[in-house]
Protein backbone atom coordinates (compact mmCIF):
# COMPACT_ATOMS: atom_id res chain seq x y z
CA UNK A 1 0.00 0.00 0.00
CA UNK A 2 2.84 2.40 0.87
CA UNK A 3 4.57 1.62 -2.44
CA UNK A 4 1.39 2.46 -4.37
CA UNK A 5 1.04 5.80 -2.57
CA UNK A 6 4.67 6.64 -3.29
CA UNK A 7 4.22 5.87 -6.97
CA UNK A 8 1.15 8.14 -7.12
CA UNK A 9 3.11 11.02 -5.56
CA UNK A 10 5.99 10.61 -8.01
CA UNK A 11 3.59 10.62 -10.95
CA UNK A 12 1.99 13.87 -9.71
CA UNK A 13 5.38 15.56 -9.26
CA UNK A 14 6.60 14.64 -12.75
CA UNK A 15 3.28 15.70 -14.25
CA UNK A 16 3.53 19.12 -12.60
CA UNK A 17 7.10 19.59 -13.81
CA UNK A 18 6.22 18.63 -17.36
CA UNK A 19 3.26 21.02 -17.43
CA UNK A 20 5.43 23.86 -16.11
CA UNK A 21 8.16 23.20 -18.67
CA UNK A 22 5.63 22.93 -21.44
CA UNK A 23 4.26 26.40 -20.63
CA UNK A 24 7.13 28.90 -20.46
CA UNK A 25 4.63 31.78 -20.62
CA UNK A 26 3.62 30.82 -17.08
CA UNK A 27 7.11 31.67 -15.80
CA UNK A 28 7.29 34.80 -17.94
CA UNK A 29 4.21 36.46 -16.46
CA UNK A 30 4.35 35.05 -12.97
CA UNK A 31 4.96 37.69 -10.30
CA UNK A 32 5.66 37.30 -6.60
CA UNK A 33 2.92 38.34 -4.21
CA UNK A 34 2.93 42.05 -3.33
CA UNK A 35 5.16 43.08 -0.44
CA UNK A 36 3.68 44.79 2.60
CA UNK A 37 6.53 47.26 3.07
CA UNK A 38 4.56 49.72 5.19
CA UNK A 39 4.38 47.20 8.04
CA UNK A 40 8.18 46.68 8.22
CA UNK A 41 10.47 48.27 10.79
CA UNK A 42 13.39 50.48 9.77
CA UNK A 43 15.92 47.63 10.01
CA UNK A 44 13.64 45.23 8.14
CA UNK A 45 13.02 47.81 5.43
CA UNK A 46 16.75 48.49 4.95
CA UNK A 47 17.64 44.79 4.92
CA UNK A 48 19.12 43.41 1.66
CA UNK A 49 16.61 41.84 -0.70
CA UNK A 50 13.68 43.32 1.24
CA UNK A 51 12.33 44.86 -1.96
CA UNK A 52 11.61 48.07 -0.04
CA UNK A 53 13.19 51.49 0.42
CA UNK A 54 13.24 53.77 3.46
CA UNK A 55 12.40 57.26 2.14
CA UNK A 56 11.80 60.60 3.92
CA UNK A 57 8.85 62.86 3.18
CA UNK A 58 8.24 66.31 4.69
CA UNK A 59 4.94 67.56 6.10
CA UNK A 60 3.59 71.08 5.77
CA UNK A 61 4.80 71.79 9.31
CA UNK A 62 8.36 70.87 8.35
CA UNK A 63 8.38 67.48 10.07
CA UNK A 64 10.43 64.86 8.25
CA UNK A 65 9.00 61.35 8.50
CA UNK A 66 10.39 58.17 6.98
CA UNK A 67 8.14 55.64 5.25
CA UNK A 68 8.96 52.14 4.10
CA UNK A 69 7.83 52.01 0.46
CA UNK A 70 7.90 49.30 -2.17
CA UNK A 71 10.85 49.55 -4.55
CA UNK A 72 9.52 49.88 -8.09
CA UNK A 73 12.82 48.74 -9.57
CA UNK A 74 13.56 52.14 -11.13
CA UNK A 75 15.47 53.60 -8.21
CA UNK A 76 12.47 55.43 -6.71
CA UNK A 77 13.56 58.65 -8.42
CA UNK A 78 11.81 61.99 -8.55
CA UNK A 79 8.25 62.13 -9.82
CA UNK A 80 5.71 64.95 -10.26
CA UNK A 81 4.93 66.29 -6.79
CA UNK A 82 1.77 64.99 -5.17
CA UNK A 83 0.28 65.21 -1.70
CA UNK A 84 -1.00 62.66 0.80
CA UNK A 85 -2.79 63.23 4.10
CA UNK A 86 -2.58 61.12 7.25
CA UNK A 87 -6.09 60.39 8.49
CA UNK A 88 -4.79 59.81 12.04
CA UNK A 89 -2.72 62.97 12.55
CA UNK A 90 -4.09 65.23 9.75
CA UNK A 91 -0.46 65.79 8.65
CA UNK A 92 -0.08 66.53 4.93
CA UNK A 93 3.05 65.16 3.24
CA UNK A 94 4.67 66.22 -0.03
CA UNK A 95 5.41 63.09 -2.07
CA UNK A 96 8.41 63.59 -4.37
CA UNK A 97 9.30 59.98 -5.25
CA UNK A 98 7.82 57.59 -7.78
CA UNK A 99 7.65 55.08 -4.90
CA UNK A 100 4.66 56.21 -2.85
CA UNK A 101 3.78 55.15 0.69
CA UNK A 102 1.08 52.51 0.91
CA UNK A 103 0.00 53.05 4.50
CA UNK A 104 -3.71 52.41 5.11
CA UNK A 105 -3.87 55.75 6.95
CA UNK A 106 -2.61 57.82 3.99
CA UNK A 107 -4.84 59.00 1.18
CA UNK A 108 -4.42 61.36 -1.78
CA UNK A 109 -4.92 65.00 -0.86
CA UNK A 110 -6.12 67.62 -3.35
CA UNK A 111 -4.31 70.95 -2.99
CA UNK A 112 -6.45 74.07 -2.80
CA UNK A 113 -5.55 76.02 -5.95
CA UNK A 114 -8.34 78.61 -6.02
CA UNK A 115 -7.70 82.23 -6.94
CA UNK A 116 -9.37 85.46 -5.89
CA UNK A 117 -10.79 85.81 -9.41
CA UNK A 118 -12.62 82.52 -8.97
CA UNK A 119 -14.06 83.52 -5.58
CA UNK A 120 -15.93 86.55 -7.04
CA UNK A 121 -15.96 88.22 -3.62
CA UNK A 122 -16.51 91.74 -4.99
CA UNK A 123 -19.71 90.64 -6.71
CA UNK A 124 -21.27 89.96 -3.31
CA UNK A 125 -19.96 93.14 -1.69
CA UNK A 126 -16.95 91.56 0.00
CA UNK A 127 -13.20 91.52 -0.43
CA UNK A 128 -10.84 88.64 -1.12
CA UNK A 129 -8.00 87.95 1.29
CA UNK A 130 -5.25 85.35 1.21
CA UNK A 131 -4.97 83.41 4.45
CA UNK A 132 -2.45 80.91 5.72
CA UNK A 133 -3.48 77.26 6.01
CA UNK A 134 -3.89 75.77 9.48
CA UNK A 135 -1.84 74.57 11.19
CA UNK A 136 1.17 75.21 8.92
CA UNK A 137 2.29 76.55 5.58
CA UNK A 138 5.52 74.91 4.51
CA UNK A 139 5.43 72.90 1.27
CA UNK A 140 3.65 73.09 -2.07
CA UNK A 141 0.87 70.98 -0.54
CA UNK A 142 -0.18 73.77 1.84
CA UNK A 143 -0.22 77.12 0.00
CA UNK A 144 -2.16 80.20 1.00
CA UNK A 145 -5.75 80.18 -0.19
CA UNK A 146 -8.31 82.95 -0.80
CA UNK A 147 -11.38 83.62 1.37
CA UNK A 148 -14.13 86.20 1.10
CA UNK A 149 -14.42 88.68 3.96
CA UNK A 150 -17.51 90.77 4.48
CA UNK A 151 -20.53 91.06 2.22
CA UNK A 152 -22.49 87.96 1.32
CA UNK A 153 -19.56 85.98 -0.08
CA UNK A 154 -19.85 83.25 2.47
CA UNK A 155 -16.79 84.36 4.41
CA UNK A 156 -18.75 85.07 7.56
CA UNK A 157 -17.23 85.58 10.99
CA UNK A 158 -14.06 83.62 11.65
CA UNK A 159 -14.21 81.39 14.70
CA UNK A 160 -11.58 82.29 17.33
CA UNK A 161 -10.92 78.54 17.61
CA UNK A 162 -9.73 78.37 14.00
CA UNK A 163 -6.04 78.67 14.86
CA UNK A 164 -6.11 76.99 18.28
CA UNK A 165 -4.96 73.43 18.90
CA UNK A 166 -5.74 72.31 22.43
CA UNK A 167 -3.79 69.70 24.39
CA UNK A 168 -5.01 66.15 24.75
CA UNK A 169 -8.28 65.81 26.69
CA UNK A 170 -9.10 69.47 25.95
CA UNK A 171 -11.24 71.04 23.23
CA UNK A 172 -11.57 74.61 22.01
CA UNK A 173 -14.81 76.49 22.70
CA UNK A 174 -15.86 79.95 21.53
CA UNK A 175 -16.85 81.76 24.73
CA UNK A 176 -17.90 85.40 24.25
CA UNK A 177 -15.73 85.69 21.15
CA UNK A 178 -12.61 84.20 22.76
CA UNK A 179 -10.86 80.87 22.30
CA UNK A 180 -10.82 78.73 25.42
CA UNK A 181 -9.34 75.25 25.80
CA UNK A 182 -11.65 73.47 28.22
CA UNK A 183 -11.66 69.90 29.43
CA UNK A 184 -13.58 67.50 27.25
CA UNK A 185 -16.78 66.26 28.86
CA UNK A 186 -16.09 62.98 30.55
CA UNK A 187 -18.59 60.13 30.70
CA UNK A 188 -20.32 59.75 34.06
CA UNK A 189 -18.59 57.31 36.40
CA UNK A 190 -20.02 53.80 36.36
CA UNK A 191 -22.50 52.93 39.06
CA UNK A 192 -20.86 51.25 42.03
CA UNK A 193 -21.08 47.50 42.24
CA UNK A 194 -23.90 46.31 44.48
CA UNK A 195 -21.31 44.69 46.75
CA UNK A 196 -19.72 48.12 47.36
CA UNK A 197 -22.93 49.82 48.45
CA UNK A 198 -22.33 48.96 52.08
CA UNK A 199 -18.58 49.64 51.97
CA UNK A 200 -17.15 53.00 53.04
CA UNK A 201 -13.53 53.53 52.06
CA UNK A 202 -11.13 56.00 53.62
CA UNK A 203 -9.80 59.16 52.04
CA UNK A 204 -7.95 58.56 48.80
CA UNK A 205 -9.38 55.07 48.35
CA UNK A 206 -12.21 53.54 46.38
CA UNK A 207 -14.16 50.33 46.45
CA UNK A 208 -13.69 47.67 43.78
CA UNK A 209 -14.82 44.08 43.44
CA UNK A 210 -11.98 41.60 43.15
CA UNK A 211 -12.47 37.83 43.05
CA UNK A 212 -16.10 38.34 44.01
CA UNK A 213 -15.23 40.38 47.10
CA UNK A 214 -15.47 44.11 47.80
CA UNK A 215 -12.25 45.78 48.90
CA UNK A 216 -10.82 49.29 49.23
CA UNK A 217 -7.83 50.19 47.09
CA UNK A 218 -5.96 53.49 46.58
CA UNK A 219 -7.43 55.69 43.86
CA UNK A 220 -5.23 55.92 40.75
CA UNK A 221 -3.15 59.08 40.76
CA UNK A 222 -3.30 61.37 37.72
CA UNK A 223 -0.15 61.41 35.59
CA UNK A 224 2.36 64.16 36.40
CA UNK A 225 2.13 67.30 34.28
CA UNK A 226 4.45 67.42 31.28
CA UNK A 227 7.78 69.21 31.79
CA UNK A 228 8.06 72.86 30.90
CA UNK A 229 10.24 72.78 27.78
CA UNK A 230 11.46 76.34 28.21
CA UNK A 231 13.03 75.49 31.57
CA UNK A 232 15.85 73.79 29.65
CA UNK A 233 16.33 76.54 27.04
CA UNK A 234 18.51 79.61 27.44
CA UNK A 235 17.71 82.24 24.83
CA UNK A 236 20.09 85.03 23.76
CA UNK A 237 19.58 88.63 24.75
CA UNK A 238 16.47 90.17 23.26
CA UNK A 239 14.65 86.83 22.93
CA UNK A 240 12.14 85.01 25.13
CA UNK A 241 11.39 81.31 25.08
CA UNK A 242 7.90 80.42 23.86
CA UNK A 243 6.54 76.89 23.58
CA UNK A 244 4.43 76.10 20.54
CA UNK A 245 4.13 73.16 18.21
CA UNK A 246 5.48 70.93 20.97
CA UNK A 247 8.89 72.60 20.85
CA UNK A 248 10.64 75.41 22.70
CA UNK A 249 11.48 78.37 20.46
CA UNK A 250 13.37 81.60 21.10
CA UNK A 251 11.26 84.47 19.75
CA UNK A 252 12.15 88.13 19.56
CA UNK A 253 10.99 90.33 22.44
CA UNK A 254 8.35 92.90 21.64
CA UNK A 255 9.86 95.47 24.04
CA UNK A 256 12.99 97.27 22.84
CA UNK A 257 14.21 97.54 26.43
CA UNK A 258 14.66 93.75 26.45
CA UNK A 259 17.00 93.68 23.45
CA UNK A 260 20.13 93.64 25.63
CA UNK A 261 18.69 92.03 28.76
CA UNK A 262 19.47 88.35 29.32
CA UNK A 263 17.18 86.07 31.36
CA UNK A 264 17.90 82.56 32.71
CA UNK A 265 16.00 79.50 31.44
CA UNK A 266 12.32 79.46 32.39
CA UNK A 267 12.08 83.26 32.71
CA UNK A 268 10.86 85.96 30.32
CA UNK A 269 11.99 89.54 29.96
CA UNK A 270 9.23 92.04 30.82
CA UNK A 271 9.26 95.82 31.12
CA UNK A 272 7.78 97.46 34.22
CA UNK A 273 5.95 100.78 34.45
CA UNK A 274 9.29 102.62 34.69
CA UNK A 275 10.43 101.12 31.36
CA UNK A 276 13.01 98.97 33.13
CA UNK A 277 13.53 95.38 31.95
CA UNK A 278 13.58 92.54 34.44
CA UNK A 279 13.22 88.76 34.39
CA UNK A 280 9.94 87.21 35.44
CA UNK A 281 8.71 83.63 35.46
CA UNK A 282 5.49 83.20 33.42
CA UNK A 283 2.38 83.00 35.55
CA UNK A 284 1.27 79.33 35.64
CA UNK A 285 -2.32 80.51 36.06
CA UNK A 286 -2.30 82.69 32.96
CA UNK A 287 -5.07 82.53 30.40
CA UNK A 288 -2.78 80.78 27.91
CA UNK A 289 -1.87 77.90 30.22
CA UNK A 290 -4.01 75.39 28.30
CA UNK A 291 -3.68 76.86 24.81
CA UNK A 292 -1.27 75.32 22.29
CA UNK A 293 -1.03 77.42 19.15
CA UNK A 294 -0.01 76.08 15.72
CA UNK A 295 3.50 76.54 14.36
CA UNK A 296 4.25 80.21 13.77
CA UNK A 297 1.66 81.42 16.29
CA UNK A 298 1.93 82.26 19.98
CA UNK A 299 -0.77 82.68 22.60
CA UNK A 300 -1.31 86.19 23.94
CA UNK A 301 -3.96 87.49 26.34
CA UNK A 302 -5.84 90.15 24.35
CA UNK A 303 -8.78 91.91 26.02
CA UNK A 304 -8.46 89.34 28.79
CA UNK A 305 -8.98 86.51 26.28
CA UNK A 306 -6.38 83.94 25.10
CA UNK A 307 -5.75 84.41 21.39
CA UNK A 308 -3.30 82.77 18.97
CA UNK A 309 -1.50 85.42 16.95
CA UNK A 310 1.29 85.12 14.40
CA UNK A 311 4.59 85.68 16.14
CA UNK A 312 7.74 86.92 14.39
CA UNK A 313 10.51 84.37 14.59
CA UNK A 314 14.14 85.39 15.10
CA UNK A 315 15.90 86.67 11.97
CA UNK A 316 16.68 83.82 9.57
CA UNK A 317 15.31 81.32 12.10
CA UNK A 318 14.84 78.48 9.55
CA UNK A 319 18.37 79.19 8.21
CA UNK A 320 19.99 77.68 11.29
CA UNK A 321 19.83 74.18 9.77
CA UNK A 322 20.78 75.20 6.22
CA UNK A 323 24.49 75.24 5.39
CA UNK A 324 25.17 77.04 2.13
CA UNK A 325 28.33 76.58 0.03
CA UNK A 326 31.09 79.17 -0.07
CA UNK A 327 29.97 82.37 -1.76
CA UNK A 328 26.32 81.80 -0.85
CA UNK A 329 24.29 82.87 2.16
CA UNK A 330 20.92 81.76 3.50
CA UNK A 331 17.93 84.06 3.11
CA UNK A 332 14.20 83.58 3.69
CA UNK A 333 12.35 83.67 0.36
CA UNK A 334 8.60 82.98 0.36
CA UNK A 335 8.89 81.75 3.98
CA UNK A 336 11.47 79.13 2.93
CA UNK A 337 15.24 79.15 3.61
CA UNK A 338 17.19 79.42 0.36
CA UNK A 339 20.87 79.70 -0.62
CA UNK A 340 21.48 82.85 -2.69
CA UNK A 341 24.75 84.05 -4.19
CA UNK A 342 26.45 86.71 -2.11
CA UNK A 343 26.84 90.01 -3.92
CA UNK A 344 29.53 92.53 -3.16
CA UNK A 345 28.13 96.01 -2.43
CA UNK A 346 29.25 98.71 -4.82
CA UNK A 347 30.97 100.71 -2.07
CA UNK A 348 33.51 97.98 -1.17
CA UNK A 349 37.16 99.00 -1.47
CA UNK A 350 39.88 96.86 -3.04
CA UNK A 351 43.69 97.11 -3.04
CA UNK A 352 43.39 99.22 -6.22
CA UNK A 353 41.66 101.91 -4.13
CA UNK A 354 44.32 102.02 -1.40
CA UNK A 355 47.90 103.29 -1.66
CA UNK A 356 49.96 101.36 0.86
CA UNK A 357 53.26 102.94 -0.19
CA UNK A 358 56.14 100.68 0.71
CA UNK A 359 53.77 98.21 2.35
CA UNK A 360 51.92 95.35 0.75
CA UNK A 361 48.15 95.33 0.39
CA UNK A 362 46.12 92.19 0.96
CA UNK A 363 42.39 91.52 0.98
CA UNK A 364 41.40 90.13 4.36
CA UNK A 365 38.03 88.60 5.31
CA UNK A 366 35.48 90.74 7.09
CA UNK A 367 33.10 89.28 9.67
CA UNK A 368 29.78 90.30 8.17
CA UNK A 369 26.50 89.61 10.00
CA UNK A 370 24.67 86.66 8.49
CA UNK A 371 22.29 87.67 5.73
CA UNK A 372 23.71 91.21 5.47
CA UNK A 373 23.82 92.46 1.88
CA UNK A 374 25.39 95.84 2.74
CA UNK A 375 28.58 94.51 4.32
CA UNK A 376 31.85 94.04 2.43
CA UNK A 377 32.93 90.41 2.60
CA UNK A 378 36.60 91.36 2.17
CA UNK A 379 38.44 94.61 2.90
CA UNK A 380 41.96 95.86 1.99
CA UNK A 381 44.68 95.85 4.63
CA UNK A 382 48.21 97.28 4.48
CA UNK A 383 50.86 94.95 5.88
CA UNK A 384 54.62 94.69 6.11
CA UNK A 385 56.17 92.92 3.11
CA UNK A 386 56.59 89.22 3.73
CA UNK A 387 60.16 87.92 4.16
CA UNK A 388 59.20 84.57 2.70
CA UNK A 389 58.32 83.62 -0.84
CA UNK A 390 54.78 82.72 0.19
CA UNK A 391 52.04 85.02 -0.93
CA UNK A 392 49.17 86.23 1.19
CA UNK A 393 46.85 83.56 -0.04
CA UNK A 394 48.76 80.91 1.91
CA UNK A 395 47.34 82.22 5.14
CA UNK A 396 43.66 81.60 5.90
CA UNK A 397 43.25 85.23 6.94
CA UNK A 398 44.68 86.51 3.65
CA UNK A 399 48.04 87.78 4.94
CA UNK A 400 51.34 86.39 6.10
CA UNK A 401 52.05 86.16 9.82
CA UNK A 402 55.82 86.58 9.42
CA UNK A 403 56.25 90.11 10.84
CA UNK A 404 59.71 90.30 12.35
CA UNK A 405 60.29 94.00 11.71
CA UNK A 406 59.29 96.57 14.29
CA UNK A 407 57.61 95.81 17.57
CA UNK A 408 54.66 93.98 16.02
CA UNK A 409 52.29 96.77 17.08
CA UNK A 410 53.22 99.41 14.50
CA UNK A 411 54.00 99.70 10.79
CA UNK A 412 56.53 102.19 9.36
CA UNK A 413 54.91 104.53 6.85
CA UNK A 414 57.63 106.38 5.03
CA UNK A 415 60.66 107.90 6.77
CA UNK A 416 58.77 109.73 9.53
CA UNK A 417 55.27 108.30 10.11
CA UNK A 418 54.57 105.07 11.97
CA UNK A 419 51.07 103.60 11.78
CA UNK A 420 49.43 101.18 14.16
CA UNK A 421 48.32 97.74 13.08
CA UNK A 422 44.71 98.88 12.84
CA UNK A 423 45.63 101.80 10.57
CA UNK A 424 46.41 102.24 6.89
CA UNK A 425 49.33 104.28 5.56
CA UNK A 426 48.26 107.05 3.16
CA UNK A 427 51.55 108.38 1.78
CA UNK A 428 49.93 110.94 -0.51
CA UNK A 429 48.17 112.56 2.46
CA UNK A 430 51.06 111.89 4.90
CA UNK A 431 48.82 110.41 7.52
CA UNK A 432 47.64 107.16 9.04
CA UNK A 433 43.95 106.40 8.58
CA UNK A 434 41.98 103.89 10.68
CA UNK A 435 41.00 100.85 8.65
CA UNK A 436 37.42 101.32 9.82
CA UNK A 437 37.19 104.43 7.62
CA UNK A 438 37.07 102.05 4.67
CA UNK A 439 34.51 99.68 6.17
CA UNK A 440 30.77 100.26 6.01
CA UNK A 441 28.94 98.08 8.53
CA UNK A 442 25.30 97.13 8.37
CA UNK A 443 22.73 98.99 10.53
CA UNK A 444 22.96 98.10 14.20
CA UNK A 445 26.69 97.28 14.01
CA UNK A 446 29.91 99.26 14.26
CA UNK A 447 33.45 98.74 12.99
CA UNK A 448 36.11 97.73 15.51
CA UNK A 449 39.67 96.55 14.81
CA UNK A 450 40.55 93.28 16.52
CA UNK A 451 43.85 92.46 18.23
CA UNK A 452 45.47 91.56 14.90
CA UNK A 453 44.45 94.83 13.28
CA UNK A 454 41.68 93.35 11.16
CA UNK A 455 38.49 95.46 11.23
CA UNK A 456 35.29 93.59 12.04
CA UNK A 457 31.65 94.65 12.35
CA UNK A 458 30.27 94.03 15.84
CA UNK A 459 26.70 94.55 17.08
CA UNK A 460 26.16 97.77 19.01
CA UNK A 461 26.52 97.24 22.72
CA UNK A 462 29.15 94.48 22.37
CA UNK A 463 32.36 95.24 24.25
CA UNK A 464 35.21 95.71 21.73
CA UNK A 465 38.51 93.91 21.91
Swiss-Prot record:
GO cellular component, one term: spore wall
Domain DSCP-N: 35-153
Residue ranges occupied by any Follistatin-like domain in the UniProt entry: 160-182, 195-217, 229-251, 257-280, 287-309, 318-340, 435-458
Sorted UniProt keywords: Repeat, Signal, Sporulation
Pfam families hit by this protein: Dicty_spore_N (PF04562)
First and last residue of the signal peptide: 1-22
The UniProt record lists the keyword Repeat: yes
One GO term (biological process): sporulation resulting in formation of a cellular spore
Entries under InterPro entries matching the protein: Dict_spore_N, Fol_N
Highest taxon, organism lineage: Eukaryota
Protein purpose: May contribute to the structure of the coat at the interface between the middle, cellulosic layer and the outer, electron-dense, proteinaceous layer.
The protein, known as: Probable spore coat protein DDB_G0283555
Organism: Dictyostelium discoideum
Amino acid sequence: MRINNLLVCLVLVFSTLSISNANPEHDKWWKPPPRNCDSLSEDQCKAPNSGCKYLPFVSCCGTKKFFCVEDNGNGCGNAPLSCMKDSKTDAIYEIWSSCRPNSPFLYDYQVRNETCDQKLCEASGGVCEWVDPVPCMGTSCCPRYPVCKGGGGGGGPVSPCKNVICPEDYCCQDIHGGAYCVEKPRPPPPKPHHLCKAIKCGRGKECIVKDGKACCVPKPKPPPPPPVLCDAVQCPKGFNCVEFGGTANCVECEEKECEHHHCPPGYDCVVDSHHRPHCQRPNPGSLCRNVTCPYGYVCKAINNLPTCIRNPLPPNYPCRDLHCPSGYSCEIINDLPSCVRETHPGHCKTCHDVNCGSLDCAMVPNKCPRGSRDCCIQIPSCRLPSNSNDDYDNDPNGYDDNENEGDGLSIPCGPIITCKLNEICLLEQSRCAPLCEFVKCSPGTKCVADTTGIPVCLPNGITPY
